[in-house]
């Protein structure tokens, strides 16, 4: 994510609703994650005893003056956004993760990941693409600027790590609450001095205007899903100047870190303009999405 509308500079308050006294350990684990990763979040914890139907979810998300988080009966943490429970839901990607390969995933064609690769997903969002990247055996560092989104990612990683079939994949994901530009500047010298940590690929999936999903001439294109609708509440599309800074810093970073040819891969809707108006070295696309590659 980039250009967050309200990335907190001080601690933000979130209401956390849980439904059972048996969830005390899970509530404590969430608070421990916040402390360990220094997230600027304060949880106002409350047990919710009434039936939490769709109408009540809608009321809670509309009436609350702070973000509302829900810990459900399966200990899945979600964010109530316009009455919808928004969560990474990594378990729903199991079939795709298991079958992921270059034949089925344009992302893997573009990144050319191997088990020895190291990649930075600099705009992690809900982490779905990070899972596909990590399915190759690669190590994936996930950067997420907004603390609320970072908490959802960390909680999902913690939950999925309890499932035996997911533990190895979860161990290859490294989630950091920071923005991409700060990370590139902060870690450049460290990575340059340690070849074992050298990065092969930087992956960017910045927010774009909602009308980018459709062809301006025909009106055809992909519909915006609930996850993307929720992100639009937290994030503004970057300005042209911000796009240029992001792409340039990513190119500079990977050119200094990669042991051989490095690449920056940018995900765009099929009909979206080029990031920073810069022509890529190569592109891969289908009917819905396009990956632009910048080789350095």
From Swiss-Prot:
Q: Which reaction does it catalyse?
A: guanosine(1516) in 16S rRNA + S-adenosyl-L-methionine = N(2)-methylguanosine(1516) in 16S rRNA + S-adenosyl-L-homocysteine + H(+)
- Read off the InterPro entries from this record: 16SrRNA_methylTrfase_J (IPR007536), SAM-dependent_MTases_sf (IPR029063)
Q: Which residues bind S-adenosyl-L-methionine?
A: 205
Which top-level group of life is the source organism from? Answer: Bacteria
Q: Which GO terms describe its cellular component?
A: cytoplasm
- Please provide the record's keywords in A-Z order: Cytoplasm, Methyltransferase, rRNA processing, S-adenosyl-L-methionine, Transferase
List localization entries: Cytoplasm
Gene Ontology molecular function terms on file:
rRNA (guanine-N2-)-methyltransferase activity
Pfam families, per the entry = SAM_MT
| UniProt key word Acetylation | no
Per UniProt, the enzyme's principal EC class comes to transferase
Free-text function comment from the UniProt entry: Specifically methylates the guanosine in position 1516 of 16S rRNA.
Query: What protein family is recorded?
Result: Belongs to the methyltransferase superfamily. RsmJ family.
Its name, as the record gives it, is: Ribosomal RNA small subunit methyltransferase J
* UniProt gene name: rsmJ
